[in-house]
């Protein structure tokens, strides 16, 4: 278990771009290859990097997400200490309205992050289909003495009539 890192996952990112698909569910719970959901990639990356304290920030239509997660049983995250914590859009003690952005949402769960024993926080979205070793990212972050480390990728636009294949 990595006692230095925890994660905050935003489950409702890009919903305005996926209107028809996210009318009744969050981006995180969109099906992928039938059995899986987009959040499975992110959770698997975190668990494979030995990160077991994970907060999931939701915005709306998250019942299918909670049904799928089952409090993290499939990732061995259903535990008394650490594990998965799901935050509704009204989690803040200081506001009675829904958060407007990620910073405001994180401020709303600041007490959760301060109570955690981990020093570093990975902030990620749930709609990323990737394979990331966060232990390597952490090692680079610490060895460089960085305050913030950001992972990015380059997207290559394609026309709708062709597909790019890695060689």
Residues covered by each model-derived region:
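Unchanged
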Residues: 1-167
